[in-house]
Amino acid sequence: MMKVFKHIVAALGFFLLGSGLSFADTPKPQDVILTWYGLVNGLVRHTPTYSPPVAARAYGYLGVTVYEAVASGSDDLQTLAGQLNGLKGLPKRESGKTYDNSVILNAALASFTPIFFKNTGPSGLGAFAALDSRLTHQVIDGMASDVVERSTAYGKSLAAAIIKWSKTDGAGGDIKNLGFDQSLKLPVGPQYWVPTNMLALQQKPLLPWWGKNRTFAIPKIDDCKFDPPIPFSEDKSSEFYKQAYEVYDVGNHLTDDQRALALFWSDDPSLTLTPAGHGVSIAMQILRRENADLEKTVDVLARLGVAQADAMIGAWHAKYTYFLLRPVTYIQRLIDPKWDALLMTPSFPDYLSGHSVQAGSMSVVMTKEYGDNYAFEDRTGEGDGLAPRSFPSFNAAAQEAASSRLYGGIHYRAAIENGLKYGKCIGQYASDLVTRK
């Protein structure tokens, strides 16, 4: 337990060092946001149920929380209530009264985070409390008591409203068995998913109901279309066999760079930030690099959060529509029984690639915010010993993230390419949200 706590605190310390913020500074409102996000990134790695869809959902609601906290007192930003599915009736600031954004944000995030990470354990809860205490002392220093009380109360009421909204999205309450539904009856046939490891809990796939959750920005998940998978066949002349053989052949002849990028984008739960957290990490690096103001910060985090949350709903909708077997299963059955992928195959169906859908959604949002040819360096994996990678654009980063699943032996090409296109469609709905008055 203490080891986990130290890892969380270390993650927060690494974030603070990279951002140039220390607790000796008086934080700006955007510093408050990014500091809490830094802690959340650490917690995603160490909270048992935080699989990729669950993490994406949390980042979605987190982004809406910080956005609405700022929009409620902004002359330029307008609320997302009425634009996001089911979001309405948010509390308002009292007209003519003085509020402080830093106090509101800290109170909202200190209320939101322990609810979404309540099963992170005593160490994680201790990290929340420590950060809340430190930031609270900083943001209220020298402030009139009535402003502190009013701002704190508003932040807490806003967080309560967002949490109430989140409870109606279909994701359910506590996730049992880490999300592996032991009651699920698996379809039977040569084309269907079967377990890819020997872990008892993972003999059933992850979160089979997730694709039915309420979306954020896209009205209905079927509003974006994707091609069905290639017709299943065991014939060596078939397209399906050729795509499986490609995974096999590529995996047997990986270059050093292909191996490196497969590991860079692996984004495994319990070890990394997950795909959505990786996308958020990229955004945070750029927000710091650009010294983004408060309104830009919350706009980017809200759009990206809801885009990636919707992307995971869409990917899981596709996965459990087709229940397609993984490449490792097909290859070991028909090509080489001793073959294994570079990366551990996740315990859920192949089609579509969740990484690809997420990456596509991220690229659309970030390209709208920063342009088609925004070059950047991604240092997300640096704390894990992974060298930074540089990209000429967000689309290039998304393409590499998607392709990494071929090099890792995780997905067929069709799941990757169609997933990327599908994710870009989903991301467009978040990109089209009206945030400026």
Model-derived segments and their meaning:
Residues M1, S19, I282:
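Regulatory/sensor and coupling segments of signal-transduction and defense proteins
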Residues M1-A10:
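Bacterial N-terminal signal peptides that target proteins for export
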Residues K3, F14, T152-G155:
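A general structural signal for short secondary-structure junctions and capping/turn motifs
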Residues V9-S19:
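Bacterial N-terminal signal peptides
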Residues F23-K437:
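Acidic/polar surface patches and capping/hinge elements
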